[in-house]
Structure formats: C-alpha cells, structure tokens
Amino acid sequence: MGRVIRGQRKGAGSVFKAHVKHRKGAAKLRHIDFAERHGYIKGIVKDIIHDPGRGAPLAKVMFRDPYRFKKRTELFIAAEGIHTGQFIYCGKKAQLNIGNVLPVGTMPEGTIVCCLEEKPGDRGKLARASGNYATVISHNPETKKSRVKLPSGSKKVISSANRAVVGVVAGGGRIDKPILKAGRAYHKYKAKRNCWPRVRGVAMNPVEHPFGGGNHQHIGKPSTIRRDAPAGRKVGLIAARRTGRLRGTKTVQDKEN
C-alpha cells in the first residue's frame, strides 16, 4: 500500500488551510434592504486598502444606517477609477456611474460590471478578481431575467434583480508582470495558502504518487481517471469528458459554450 498522497492530505485541512488571520475581512455588497429596493442610499469611500492574499484592492465605504442612528462601514471590491472621498450610490434608482451598485435589470445592454450577484441578495459572487468584469448582454422583461457574459467567456442567465458594481475590478494587469524569481512566488503563496512549491507526480517515487517511478519521468498509464476511483488513485484528469487541445474554429467553440 502506498503512502497517503498529497490530494488526500489536503482534504484533511490542517496546514493546507487558507491563511486568513491577517486578512481585512469579507468583501461583499450591502445587505439588501428597503432603501436599495425602492430608491438608493449614499455612502462615501473612506479608504482604499490592500488585502493580503488578494490581487484586487478593497474600498472601505461608510453608510448611514437607515434604521438606527449609527454608521456602518462596508468592504467593497474596489472598481477601477474610484477614489477616497467619492460618493457611492447603491439602489434601484442610483445613477449609472463607476463604483455604484445597481440591479442588472436597470442597466443598459453592454454595461460592464463586476462583483455580480449569482442569486438575488448573495452580496456578490461573480467577476471579483483583479481586472475582471462581466458584460450585460440582454434583458427579458417578461421573465425578469438578464443574460451576462462572464470573464471566462461563458454566458449565464441570472435574475434581473441581481445587483452588481458598475465598472471593472481595480488591479488589472497584475499578471502581466512576470514573477521572475522563486522568492517572489514564495511570498505570494505564503499570503494565500500552503500550495507552493508543487512537486510533479512523475518526479516522485511510486510509493508517493500513482504517476511516480520509472527509469525516466513518464506517467506510464492513461492520465484520465474515473469519478468513483479511491482517493489515493484519483489524480490526473478526473472524469474528463475530453482531453487534448481545443481544435477547430472559434465559432464552433462558442456554440459549445
């Protein structure tokens, strides 16, 4: 019997958990309330901060609580172009300006948005990474659904009541700069999680990985593996529908999506 492989150890958590102790908090939209459903609420950008382990900067936005005499600070994913002291408007009747939060159904077709809700009230789940954005393609007023194009290129039908931030996530072009040296990768992943450096399976011994061993580094068996394989064998291309390069014209690929 071989050893417990890396994938099995990761499932147990422990040293493989995300490094979250030093992070600034969960970046989400406001809880949806009466003010956002029927009008708008005004907030002000107090600060733009770096969140360790995240490529995009965060914005601290202060709102007056509509129900109590107090102020609430929310952490938003910063849209490119916002600045400290800027007013942010959230709600159905807010204007279509960079950084404002509106329901997708009120936006014209072709609007570029980020931090988009997947389901109404989930406070932003899609297009959140630095430089990412989704595009509003079309609306169907009868079914109250909207179609959006996600950063992956796939198109998704969502409720028109889903909110989104107008604009592109700040920090774009981050991956254009090459890492160049191992020390930078070390510090990058130290802030994120314990996943670096990653030893290839074919470079291991047979006891440590199903692809290990041999007089030269080769897998020696099909890299595809069935879905119900035991955990110690489930490595490679798990339950792959297809393998290899995407061949053919772009139009064919779009039809598949």
Swiss-Prot record:
Keywords: Cytoplasm, Ribonucleoprotein, Ribosomal protein, RNA-binding, rRNA-binding. Its main location: cytoplasm. Pfam families: Ribosomal_L2 (PF00181), Ribosomal_L2_C (PF03947). It is found in: Cytoplasm. One of its GO terms (molecular function) is RNA binding. Belongs to the universal ribosomal protein uL2 family. Component of the large ribosomal subunit. Component of the large ribosomal subunit. The ribosome is a large ribonucleoprotein complex responsible for the synthesis of proteins in the cell. This is Large ribosomal subunit protein uL2.
